[in-house]
């Protein structure tokens, strides 16, 4: 597998949960769009969503992907475990958020992942996933993997 997309807590509710912030697309809509882009670029992609921190840590540790795209959702601000998992595997990842975390409540403005991420994309709604995948494909091509 080339790219793994991980979605954290409550992202299974996209399309229903606060559409004025997160938009109307479901996680399935986003995944289908990403799958098409990956297929058109001869890149393999897999998707994982969990509301449980330990399951996300396990998935990061077990991943054979060349690069990971992650929307850690609320765990962005609280999960030292997810941060440590990325440090342990020493694999590039792109942090993505549908909303601009720096234009939200004060407690949402600190990311425990941004400083160790390959790159970060905030505030472009579902299009942010497309931007992240394009950059992941660029990374794979640059590395010649």
Curated annotation (Swiss-Prot):
Which residues make up the annotated site Transition state stabilizer? Answer: 17
**Pathway of action:** Metabolic intermediate biosynthesis; chorismate biosynthesis; chorismate from D-erythrose 4-phosphate and phosphoenolpyruvate: step 3/7
The residues that hold substrate are 71, 77, 84, 98-99, 108
Active-site residues per Swiss-Prot or TrEMBL entry:
22, 97
Q: Which domain of life is it from?
A: Bacteria
Entry EC no(s): 4.2.1.10
Name one process (GO BP) from the record: amino acid biosynthetic process
User: What GO terms are given for molecular function?
Assistant: 3-dehydroquinate dehydratase activity
User: Do you know which PROSITE patterns this protein is assigned to?
Assistant: DEHYDROQUINASE_II
The protein's matches in Pfam families, at most eight in alphabetical order, are given as:
DHquinase_II
Membrane-spanning parts: none
Alphabetically sorted, this entry's keywords are: Amino-acid biosynthesis, Aromatic amino acid biosynthesis, Lyase
Substrates-to-products reaction catalysed: 3-dehydroquinate = 3-dehydroshikimate + H2O
Q: Which PANTHER family match?
A: CATABOLIC 3-DEHYDROQUINASE (PTHR21272:SF3)
* Assembly behavior: Homododecamer.
What family name appears in the similarity comment?
Belongs to the type-II 3-dehydroquinase family.
What job does the chain carry out?
Answer: Catalyzes a trans-dehydration via an enolate intermediate.
NCBIfam families the UniProt entry points to:
aroQ, PRK05395.1-1, PRK05395.1-2, PRK05395.1-3, PRK05395.1-4
Q: What is this protein called?
A: 3-dehydroquinate dehydratase
Q: What is the lineage of its organism?
A: Bacteria, Pseudomonadati, Pseudomonadota, Gammaproteobacteria, Thiotrichales
Q: Which gene encodes it?
A: aroQ
């Amino acid at each position: 597998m080339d790219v793994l997309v991980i979605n954290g807590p409550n992202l299974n509710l996209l399309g229903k949960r606060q559409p004025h912030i997160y938009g109307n697309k479901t996680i399935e809509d986003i995944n289908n769009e990403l799958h098409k882009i990956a297929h058109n670029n001869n890149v393999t992609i897999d998707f994982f969503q969990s509301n449980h921190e330990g399951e996300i840590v396990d998935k990061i540790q077990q991943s054979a992907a060349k690069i990971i795209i992650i929307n850690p959702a609320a765990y962005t601000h609280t999960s030292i475990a997810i941060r440590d998992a990325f440090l342990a595997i020493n694999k590039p990842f792109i942090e993505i958020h549908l909303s601009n975390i720096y234009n939200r409540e004060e407690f949402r403005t600190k990311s425990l992942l941004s400083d160790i991420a390959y790159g970060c994309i905030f505030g472009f709604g579902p299009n942010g996933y497309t931007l992240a995948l394009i950059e992941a494909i660029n990374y794979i091509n640059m590395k010649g993997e």
